[in-house]
């Protein structure tokens, strides 16, 4: 089984992982609902690209 010849120090390990970061989610202002929402997603009110694509009139009972 292969093992490292030298112990990897904290500095070496952290500098290697320094470029790994969380990205900011892509959000934009939706003029139809007047709220910010994630890009390429349907708004909570059911609008996408200015059109209503999901009907939210039902109360969740099937």
Curated annotation (Swiss-Prot):
Residues 7-20 have a biased composition (Basic residues). Keywords: Ribonucleoprotein, Ribosomal protein. Residues 1-20 are annotated as: Disordered. GO terms for biological process: translation. InterPro entries: Ribosomal_bL32, Ribosomal_bL32_bact, Ribosomal_zn-bd. GO terms for cellular component: large ribosomal subunit. Pfam families: Ribosomal_L32p. The keyword Cytoplasm does not apply. GO terms for molecular function: structural constituent of ribosome. Belongs to the bacterial ribosomal protein bL32 family. This is Large ribosomal subunit protein bL32. The gene is rpmF.
